[in-house]
Regions:
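Structured C-terminal cap/extension of enzyme domains
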Residues: 637-691
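Acidic/aromatic-lined carbohydrate-recognition and catalytic surfaces
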Residues: 18-84, 88-91, 96-127, 140-378
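Basic helix-extension-helix modules of the SAP/HeH family
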Residues: 1-23
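Short, solvent-exposed cationic patches
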Residues: 555-557, 563-568, 679-692
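Residue-level detector of anion-binding/catalytic polar loops
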Residues: 4, 193-194, 358-360, 434, ...
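Alpha-amylase-like alpha-glycosidases and glucanotransferases acting on alpha-linked glucans and related
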Residues: 84, 207-342, 368-629, 633, ...
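Short acidic/polar inter-strand loop motif in beta-rich domains
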Residues: 130-135
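Residues at alpha-helix termini
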Residues: 2-4, 17, 189, 354, ...
Length: 692
């Protein structure tokens, strides 16, 4: 794309026709060029023996077209299922499409129909014609994810937390896998929830400096080793005494500062952990552990190898080969890191469920990846590398957003049988009872813009949503997991209908929920198939939101286009609408609170902020939502914004803010049991018994 030419100069068909893959268009292609490209694509489709991939449900009887050389019959057409059994496809439908001459070859089209009731899974369709065999992937998904109905009938509550910010006294300056289990156990023991929603754990750069944002990873399939708890690796016992002493000293340097009221600095933490991890890796493993490691490598296949090779290549290019013994290539080290991550995440999930959590860990899936990361290179064949994903301008970010992430290329992903999408989901769901998909509307369409250009130059590009959503449902069904789609933002209502059909629950946030009859949404108007919460990680904690920090911070950073006083006044009026609804429908029950109307009240005239926060969570707990989620920052009185969209590190310390209380002091997991507010909001967040 040329510097001055935005994607909004093109239609979606134009983008498909010019195959937006990195070509440098200095000006808009002529209409003749676009039409010729479109015709070329249509010809390519008509000369394709089988579709790129077929995705259907286990209740549909789906029709599909095959193409053979004119006059040549379809000799064989059959399905090979996952279990190696075979089913011939015999039902042919009428098709009056005339043959076409494409580059001197006459092609004909025939239509066949798949039978309904096919088993769920990943299968293969094979076509044989003129002694030539062709195949494509067939994916059969559930019509509806069964776990959704389980929680609609028996609603549960959970807690959301940013793992890096939630530390214990033994942490190395950042929350880690052991802290997940510790926090989950603490929450379960206090009746605070059946799941723990945490930020994406996707891997960042293989060595410092590393990206702070968990939503801009190097890969979405593999895990960030910065979360490894060094002391929980069995092979630490094999270290020589002097090396073990060195590792202990590294840990001490960070543990002593866990209560320092400073931002989280990932680079020194990761550098120290990598030093310790290399020592443990070189200490070796016993025969049993070595076999487990090799089994893991075999199971993960080419994807793990490609990722580890990318990491090793980055290391050698920047650091040289001196970090490894000659007989221990860096590739093995990076595969080993992923194995340790996998084991420790499994232990964290086991600890959560052993404590009584029904779901346990709820993983978070970022929208995309870093443009120069592992996935951008190893999955380049299914991405559109010269595009960037973001969001158009809206009321909360009036300049729009550029997330600096290359999007899936719709057709290339289908050509790959959606296997990169499947493999990523399987890895994430292996040790999680649920998954939240950030910006789930990206499974329908994504806002593309040329890289390094303004979000105002962008346009939406559509995806095969039934394929992407159906595969989510299939992999979640196999994992026994729930799926939450973050469906906030600009969308058409039918998209929510599709998600609901597949059993993908939506997201409802108290402050964003207006009633179709005016004012704030009433309890009974909330969706059942959703995760309802008071706040999100893109808003200040509720105490800060009530004080207007979501507006004053944007004003301080130059992100507010409208008048500050007008914005604050409009926000205050809407907060009054919401709080009046909370008051009207029992949110303040049991509180020493005597106000009868929030309208006309200044922010400091509405009573104790802790009471308001507690009431908001009590209200959400009584909605019919299948899942409700309480922010850990609210349970400790924090007011600090974790992430301010549309800003860089130089403007705001996004994703580096530690957990603090209302007084601004650091809070560790060890402190939670001694905090009255933690217990108060935990109790307010309890779901009422069915029928109450």
């Amino acid at each position: 794309m040329g510097v001055d030419l935005g994607l909004n100069d093109y239609s979606v068909d134009d983008l498909a026709a010019i195959d937006f893959d990195g070509a440098d268009y200095d000006k808009r292609p002529s209409e003749e060029t676009v039409q010729a490209a479109l015709q070329r694509r249509h010809d390519q489709e008509f000369s394709r023996p089988l579709p790129r991939c077929i995705v259907t449900t286990d209740t549909e009887s789906q029709a599909f077209n095959v193409h053979v050389r004119d006059g040549k019959p379809v000799d064989q057409l059959f399905i090979t299922f996952e279990n190696s059994s075979v089913l011939e496809i015999t039902e042919q439908l009428e098709n009056w499409e005339p043959p076409r001459d494409i580059d001197g070859v006459i092609w004909g089209e025939a239509t066949f129909q798949l039978p309904a009731g096919l088993p769920q899974g990943w299968h293969t369709i094979t076509l044989v014609s003129d002694n030539i065999s062709h195949s494509c992937t067939l994916v059969v998904t559930p019509t509806h994810l069964s776990t959704t109905d389980t929680y609609i009938n028996n609603p549960v509550a959970g807690v959301m937390a940013q793992l890096y910010s939630v530390r214990s006294s033994d942490s190395w300056g950042i929350g880690d896998f052991r802290d997940i289990g510790y926090l989950g156990e603490t929450l379960a023991n206090n009746g605070a929830g059946d799941f723990l929603l945490i930020n994406p754990l996707h891997a960042a750069e293989p060595f410092p400096p590393v990206e702070d944002s968990p939503y801009l990873p190097a890969t979405r399939r593999f895990i960030n080793p910065i979360y490894i708890r060094i002391e929980d690796i069995p092979e630490i016992e094999l270290l020589a005494e002097d090396v073990r002493t060195e590792v202990t000293e590294l840990a001490r340097q960070f543990r002593e500062h866990n209560r320092d009221n400073v931002q989280i600095e990932r680079d020194p933490i990761y550098e120290a952990k990598l030093r310790a991890l290399r020592e443990i890796f070189h200490a070796g493993r016993d025969e049993t552990r070595e076999q487990l490691f090799r089994d893991y490598i075999h199971r993960e296949g080419d994807g793990l190898t490609a990722f580890a090779e990318w990491c090793a290549k980055q290391e050698i290019a920047k650091l040289g080969t001196g970090n490894h013994a000659e007989d221990e290539p860096p590739v093995d080290f990076y595969m080993w890191l992923q194995w340790i991550c996998d084991q420790q995440l499994a232990a964290a999930q086991a600890r959560c469920t052993a404590a009584g959590m029904k779901i346990g860990i709820m993983a978070d899936l970022a929208v995309g990846v870093h443009p120069f990361g592992a996935d951008a290179e190893t999955l380049a064949n299914v991405l559109a590398p010269c595009a960037s994903v973001g969001a158009p301008p809206d009321n909360y970010n009036q300049y729009g957003q550029d997330w600096s992430q290359p999007p899936w290329h719709p057709e290339r992903l289908a050509e790959a049988g959606y296997k990169p999408w499947r493999d990523m989901l399987r890895t994430i769901l292996r040790h999680a009872g649920g998954i939240r998909i950030d910006h789930v509307l990206g499974l329908f369409r994504l806002y593309w813009m040329p890289r390094n250009q303004s979000p105002q130059t962008g346009t939406y590009v559509n995806y095969d949503f039934r394929a992407l959503v159906g595969i989510v449902a299939l992999e979640a069904e196999r994992a026994g997991a729930v799926v939450i789609g973050e469906d906030l933002g600009t969308f058409e209502p039918w998209m929510q209908d599709v998600l609901n059909q597949y059993g993908i629950m939506g997201t409802s946030v108290l402050w964003f929920e207006g009633s179709p009859y005016g004012g704030a949404r009433r309890l009974e108007e909330y969706r059942k198939a959703c995760l309802a919460s008071v706040t999100t990680h893109d808003l200040p904690p509720t105490a800060g939101f009530l004080r207007g920090k979501h507006i004053t911070l944007r004003n301080e950073l130059g992100l507010l286009k409208s008048n500050l006083d007008e914005e604050l006044n409009n926000d205050l009026n809407w907060q009054a609408e919401v709080l009046n609804r909370v008051l009207e429908q029992g949110g303040f029950a049991g509180e020493d609170f005597h106000m009868d109307n929030f309208h006309g009240r200044a922010r400091d005239e509405r009573g104790d902020v802790e009471v308001l926060v507690t009431a908001a969570h009590r209200f959400v707990a009584h909605t019919p939502a299948a899942l409700t989620c309480t922010a850990l920052v609210d349970m400790v009185g924090d007011e600090n914004v974790q992430n301010q969209p549309g800003t860089a590190k130089e403007q705001y310390p996004n994703w580096c803010v530690p957990l603090r209380n209302a007084q601004g002091n650091i809070v560790l997991i060890d402190d939670l049991n001694e905090m009255p507010l933690f217990h108060k909001i935990a109790e307010a967040s309890h779901r009422p018994a069915p029928g109450n």
